[in-house]
Amino acid sequence: MQDSGFKKKDRSTNIPQEQFVYTRGGEHKVMKKVVNSVLASALAITVAPMAFAAEDTTTAPKMDAAMEKTVKRLEALGLVAGYGNGDFGADKTITRAEFATLIVRARGLEQGAKLAQFNTTYTDVRSTDWFAGFVNVASGEEIVKGFPDKSFKPQNQVTYAEAVTMIVRALGYEPSVRGVWPNSMISKGSELNIAKGINNPNMQQFAATIFKMLDNALRVKLMEQIEYGTDIRLNVTDETLLTKYLKVTVRDMDWAHEKGNNSDELPLVTNVPAIGLGSLKANEVTLNGKDADLGSNTTYKVAEGINPNAFDGQKVQVWIKDDRENVIVWMEGSEDEDVVMDRVSALYLKGKAFTDDIVKDLSKSDLDDVKIEMDGSEKSYRLTEDTKITYNFTRFNDPVDALSKIYKDNDTFGVKVVLNDNNEVAYLHIIDDQTIDKSVKGVKYGSKVISKIDADKKKITNLDNSKFSDLEDQDEGKDFLVFLDGQPAKLGDLKESDVYSVYYADGDKDKYLVFANRNVAEGKVEKVVSRNKTDIRLTVGGKTYKVYPDASYSENANKDVKKVNSDLDLISNLDGEEVKLLLDPSGRVRHIETKDAIDDRKPLAIITKGATYNSSKDTYDFTVMTQKGKTQIVSLDQKDIYDRYGVNYDKSNDKRQAFEKDLVELLQPKVVKEDSATDANQTVLLEVNFDSKGEVDKVKVLDSKLKYSEKSTWDKLADEDDDVVGDYEVTDKTAVFKMTGDLTPATGTKRGELKNAGTAKFKDVAKKSDLKVWYSVDEDKGEVQAIFVVDGSGLGGDHQFGMVKQYGTASKQDTITIVTKDGDSVTEKEYKLDGDADDLKVDQDIRRGDVISFTLNSDGEVIVDDVVEVVNNNHIDNTASKSATLMPEDERQKAGIDKLVVARVDEVDGNTISLNYADGKTQKYYTKASTAFIDVYDGLEGIDGVDEGDYIVMIDSADIDGTRFDYVLVVSSDDEIRTQHISTKAVTDFLNKPTRLCTKSWRWGRSSHGTKVNTVNDEAVVDGIVTLPADASVRNFNIAFDQEINSKDATVTVTNEDTLGNVTVSEVATDAKVLSFKTAKLDTTKTYIITVKGLKDKNGKAVKDVTLYVEFVAGV
């Protein structure tokens, strides 16, 4: 079957702390969401220097990223040198002598300072002072003038007024200054944008402030005096300190906007080290600057502090130092070019999502009709035939090949989009920053977590004990580059617990790019949310982090590292635990560290399926339900099963008590509904011990002293207000089990089984007067140990309906978030569960987007045992098993449903919805002001109503008065059907659902070999074959599964849909993966429902019940 295309992304899958970044000319604009990826860090757009605003404070400015770039730029220009260890003293004050030195260098007079060393001008400047020549030159150029006493006071800390005065003089603007010093100079400095908002001009200035002022002055146009005497004439030239004195070629926005130039003529970055390693060194970049008179594809060195990889595919502003090997000392993006950093959501051709067929036929002529949709901003951008595409640092000559590869990988990878003047994509760079444990040479290695780094041997050892040794014979800077948190680094800078991935420059298997990040979140887990098996989230410190299904974890300081492997129980048990989360560049959890074992609890449990001895493993296998409502299959050696005295059942144990029963007999479910002391003592209460993997490693049979009570006596004995049963206290550790289901006793080799076991709240059990109850007590503590409800019903309230949004864990209790009706509105509510979430997620396969019927107990908790899936899957899909499926008609009463209608909306008029059925008939149905409208396929939220062309499911609740519909669920729309290429058959199958009891029809023909069919409603079923024997007196059925099955306890029912009469079934058998059976002769003009229950896999685990709709069509 054709793939339906780029999957529509769930917009709410983005982590809350993420953001979408839009950039124009280096200025970051934070929009809706964040993209913390290798792309956003390694290729991030640099921030343009901001005009400095000094504050009235004595706190030194911090050496932030912007200041660091300023200082690196001044260093590259030869203006500042620092202390040789990367420290430029930005947090220190600066003297008058030091500042005079900076100004002389900025005027290009450093060589003259050497000659002026002995031309002393001031009384306090000696020729032996290191700064003497600079002060003397500054004095000669009238940049400094000293004090009336002929001193210079070189060691005084320079004030803003003094510094701005020297700068204004150096720029030639002193003749234009009018007024009294220092205000006159401060005013002129502000006019020239040297600095703004200085509150205290007499306060000493830190070096960072001075550096910023000097940096701002570099691009100010110089003034020169062309007439002297009484007729003074001044002229502002086209020269600056950069161009006239420092010999710098300037190609920036000022240049682009003067002399008829424009920003399109700025140089284009055509190659960077992260892509062209081998042809480029780590500190080089290639520019196409033909229109800027810089030549075509010229390679330049870049000064320290410039990351050229940030500008690949962009127009850039540059300052090039002409007398130093053409070194670029400053680089920023063009202010007239839009750059978007986001994530890929989908690709479209002429409005339709990419599919296998579209990609197969895609050609370069189609590119003008291709759009790429962003996941964060939800905006789309059109490609052109000239769009350049890079994927994982590999350039593609043919953009069609690139798009095919990106579509095949199909994920929300990080993306950098450079737009042209028409808002079309000029350049596209996409990076897979989310795949973990990948190892494809020439594509990607990782992500991994570092355990040990050996920089000398160039070897990285990972937490999982694997090693990356490919760098051993390579030269750093030539054969491989290292980036840490997006900035160029050295291999020796990496540390234990860094998360890293390795890419390959332009796909070259011998050129490596090591990208590492050091992003850690630590603290107590406040909440655990599970939307599905691949979408699990932890909230720590108020921020929510998504956990990779294959993330690793350790409970003992990384001595033992294991995989999460989508173990929802494992993650749920992190609730309330202190954790350390190692995040990858996209902000997702790559590794989890805990201080203690994730689950060291010992819950109480009852047996729901009796023990059997497994001779092949020498274990006793049985099933229990814990007090949390979790069903657990147990398989233990007898030495791991203990009696009430703490003595195990090992055969060699000579301490075994003679009166202890055989284990198979002992470990059977027992339900006694009358007051019988003998029988009551047979009820087994267990204490179950879980290991660090969440598996049962020990079970203890408890010494339970059971008491019996029933009906009104129980109602008086149990007090929900005081939490007592008679004289015994009910605590938060008291287990309450519902054991009202059918019990099949153990007979011979057949195991006993308790159906529909569950858990309940004491408050619900205590207020009922129609129950039969056993309870066990701890006499020493005066507490109720466990309560067993063996007869009675009605522990829940009215049925409600809603769409599952996600699962979670809070305060050590599983939760479920449901979009549901709340009065006259629709809201998103988080409910606590009275049992285990796995009973819904795993046993019933209820997932995000599914619609359920549920009831609440007196504590407002969802009663797990009462949850019924009403609509499975939240959209119409070409694959039947993935398309919206309704619950069987005969189960709707149990779910509290009076009516269930499926149709396409033909017309909406107020509270009247006209529905167009598949056969063309139209019928009107009515809603009301309180009707809940829920979008279950796209927004996953409440909406105001429905529109023409919507595909809907309407529910009338039996527990809400009136005949108008109470819930309307939108599962698709005409627009969605079109863009996602949904077939007419899939739509027709959906519209036919009200007349079906299941999701798939088998069509049988009068051929002797039978007819294969595709997947039915359960994904475990692969196909089925109906064959017609020669005598035509019976029908042979074969149902094939994708796993080995056991039909020993299975029941097969074949029912005539019209008469609801059952057909005789015989010879039910299993051969590996195939279930076969025979029926009596069937009427080929009728339709039949086949129901298979009680199937198990080869390990004895229950397989979901199967319902098939069989239609006989002659001649097929």
From Swiss-Prot:
Domain SLH: 54-117, 118-181, 182-231
Signal peptide: 1-53
Pfam families according to UniProt: SLH
InterPro entries for the chain: SLH_dom
Superkingdom of the organism of origin: Bacteria
Keyword Membrane: no
Protein name, UniProt field: Surface layer protein
